[in-house]
């Protein structure tokens, strides 16, 4: 069974980058939780370094990952530079990253660019969580938090971004993405020519905790 470790950057007293009252830690958590939900829906075991607004040190993050064997480690972040001066997404792997991490990074980056982010490419870096984790690792910067256009894109397409990242991970795991069904199926529990009998059946169903209504047809 596929198993991944998701790391939502910053948290608690560590806000990460801040712009006009907007905190990176919150964006990272919100997006990451959505990705986790999509992966779990497809049967992937997901362990999260944090699932609420708490501080976790870099060492504790890597220690958490090293306790188990994961197919991949994915760290979520948002970038920052000078207000309104830079924009786009970029995805990082370790300076001597594995082929698997490179493949996943390319899939994630392609997905984000397809949703409208400027392509800043797949890059290498000596980031702690990439260096000190043992599984193939990537760190994704989902746009610049100090760029209004990137924030608008992040907010308006949050679900699509989460879905795109999840699809990239699933593709890397050779798991087919399945769309959620919007079809509703109604169950009939009988047809009666006498209204009193229909009302009795509705009463029985409601006593069992089943929502039921009478629909009259001719």
Model-derived features with residue positions:
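Solvent-exposed beta-strand motifs enriched in subsets of small alpha/beta binding domains
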Residues: 178-218
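Active-site-proximal helix/loop segments of hydrolytic enzymes
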Residues: 2-4, 13-14, 22, 26-180
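Short, polar loop/linker segments at the starts of domains and inter-domain junctions
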Residues: 19, 152-153, 200-205
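Short, Lys/Arg-enriched, disordered terminal segments
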Residues: 1-2, 218
């Amino acid at each position: 069974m596929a198993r991944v470790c998701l790391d939502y950057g910053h948290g608690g007293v560590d806000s990460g980058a801040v712009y006009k009252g907007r905190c990176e830690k919150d964006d990272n958590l919100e997006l990451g939780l959505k990705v986790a939900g999509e992966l779990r829906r497809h049967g992937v075991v997901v362990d999260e370094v944090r699932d609420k607004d708490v501080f976790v040190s870099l060492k504790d993050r890597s220690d958490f990952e090293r306790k188990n064997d994961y197919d991949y480690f994915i760290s979520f972040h948002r970038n920052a530079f000078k207000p309104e001066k830079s924009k786009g997404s970029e995805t990082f792997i370790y300076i001597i990253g594995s082929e698997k991490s490179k493949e996943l990074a390319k899939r994630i980056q392609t997905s984000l660019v397809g949703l409208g982010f400027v392509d800043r490419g797949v890059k290498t870096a000596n980031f702690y969580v990439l260096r000190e984790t043992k599984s193939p690792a990537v760190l994704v910067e989902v746009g610049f938090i100090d760029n209004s256009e990137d924030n608008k894109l992040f907010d308006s397409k949050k679900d699509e971004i989460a879905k795109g990242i999840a699809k990239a991970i699933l593709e890397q795991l050779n798991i087919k993405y399945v769309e959620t069904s919007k079809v509703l199926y109604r169950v009939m529990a009988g047809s009666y020519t006498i209204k009193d009998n229909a009302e009795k059946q509705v009463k029985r169903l409601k006593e069992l905790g089943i929502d039921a209504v009478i629909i009259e047809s001719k």
